[in-house]
Amino acid sequence: MAPKQDPKPKFQEGERVLCFHGPLLYEAKCVKVAIKDKQVKYFIHYSGWNKKSAVRPRRSEKSLKTREDIVALFPVPEGAPSVHHPLLTSSWDEWVPESRVLKYVDTNLQKQRELQKANQEQYAEGKMRGAAPGKKTSGLQQKNVEVKTKKNKQKTPGNGDGGSTSETPQPPRKKRARVDPTVENEETFMNRVEVKVKIPEELKPWLVDDWDLITRQKQLFYLPAKKNVDSILEDYANYKKSRGNTDNKEYAVNEVVAGIKEYFNVMLGTQLLYKFERPQYAEILADHPDAPMSQVYGAPHLLRLFVRIGAMLAYTPLDEKSLALLLNYLHDFLKYLAKNSATLFSASDYEVAPPEYHRKAV
C-alpha cells in the first residue's frame, strides 16, 4: 500500500487571504506555508495589526513567574507559538490551521461584512440592556465568571458536563453538508464558551448613555479625548504603585495595562465603534496615521472594550486558574473606572454632529 501523500496547500506564500481571529474575519497575508503531521498550517500576518506602539515587557528573572502568568492571561489563539505573543513582540502574526483561512474573493468578503454587522448588532443590543450581550448564562461564582455555550441552551456546570458535549457533533456535520467547506471554521468558533467580564453597576448607565448619545441623538465623542486611554491606564498603574505593591505585583499590573492597551488598539476599528462613528474614525486615521488609537480615544470607548474582550478571550486556551487571575485584574481595573467615573465620563464630552457629517454617515 502506497504511503499517504501530504495534503496540498490551498494557499500560497504571499497570497492575500481572509483569516478568522475570534468570531470575525480579517484581511491578512499568507507569509509561510508548513506541513506537519499531515496538516497544513499557514503563518499569517494580519494587515494593519502591527503597531509601532507595541509594548515589549522588561526581562527580569525575579519577576519571570509573574511575567509568564500575565502572558497566559492574554493568549493568542491555538497554533501560535509563544514567541509571537503580542505582549512579547510588536507582532500579531501567528500560525493557523487551514480551516481558519479563506480565499480573498467576493463571496467571503460578503461573509466578512455579514459577521461584522452581526457583531455590531449584538453589541448594540447589549448596550441597550446596559450589560454584555447574552441571555442564557451560568456562573462559576467563586471565580466571578459567567460562561455560556452558543449551541447548548442548558446551564453548564463549572467543570463541564460530559452528557451535554456528546450531543454536539451532529449539528455541525449537518450544517457543514449544506455550506461551503471554507466556512466550516465558523461553526467551530461559534461552539466555543464565551467568557464574560462583569461590568460594575455604577458603569452600566454610562454604557446606555453612550449608546443613546451616539445612535439616537447623533452626537459624537469629542476627539482627541481630553483624557485618552493611555493616560487613564497610566493613572491606574500609578495608583496601584502608590498603594505599596511588591515588585512582582507592580510588574503584573504594568503587563496587564500593556495588554489592555494592545487589545484596545487592535479591536477599536472593527468591534468598538457604532456605525455613526465610522466617518469620524476615518478622519482620525487620515489626520493621525501613525498614532495608536489609545492616544486619541477616551473612557467611553475603553469601557466598550470590556463588553467585548470576553468574546475575544473565549477563542483562546484558558484554564480555570488563568481565567480567574485574568478576571481578577480586569475587574480591579473596572472598579477603578467606577470609582473615578465622575471625572472620566461626562455627556459634555459629546458634541452634535454637523449636517455635513450626517451626509457622510448615511
Swiss-Prot record:
Keyword DNA repair: yes
Interaction with RB1-2: region residues: 323-344
Residues with the N6-acetyllysine modification: 143
Location of region: Interaction with KAT8: 26-62
GO cellular component, one term: nucleosome
Gene Ontology terms describing biological process: cell population proliferation; chromatin remodeling; double-strand break repair via homologous recombination; fibroblast proliferation; positive regulation of DNA-templated transcription; positive regulation of double-strand break repair via homologous recombination; regulation of apoptotic process; regulation of cell cycle
Compartments where found: Nucleus
Domain Tudor-knot: 12-51
Region span, Sufficient for interaction with SIN3A: 133-266
Stretches for region Sufficient for interaction with PHF12: 188-342
Free-text function comment from the UniProt entry: Component of the NuA4 histone acetyltransferase (HAT) complex which is involved in transcriptional activation of select genes principally by acetylation of nucleosomal histones H4 and H2A. This modification may both alter nucleosome - DNA interactions and promote interaction of the modified histones with other proteins which positively regulate transcription.
PANTHER family, A to Z: MORTALITY FACTOR 4-LIKE PROTEIN (PTHR10880), MORTALITY FACTOR 4-LIKE PROTEIN 1 (PTHR10880:SF29)
Assembly: Component of the NuA4 histone acetyltransferase complex which contains the catalytic subunit KAT5/TIP60 and the subunits EP400, TRRAP/PAF400, BRD8/SMAP, EPC1, DMAP1/DNMAP1, RUVBL1/TIP49, RUVBL2, ING3, actin, ACTL6A/BAF53A, MORF4L1/MRG15, MORF4L2/MRGX, MRGBP, YEATS4/GAS41, VPS72/YL1 and MEAF6. The NuA4 complex interacts with MYC and the adenovirus E1A protein. MORF4L1 may also participate in the formation of NuA4 related complexes which lack the KAT5/TIP60 catalytic subunit, but which include the SWI/SNF related protein SRCAP.
Stated name of the protein: Mortality factor 4-like protein 1
Taxonomic classification: Eukaryota, Metazoa, Chordata, Craniata, Vertebrata
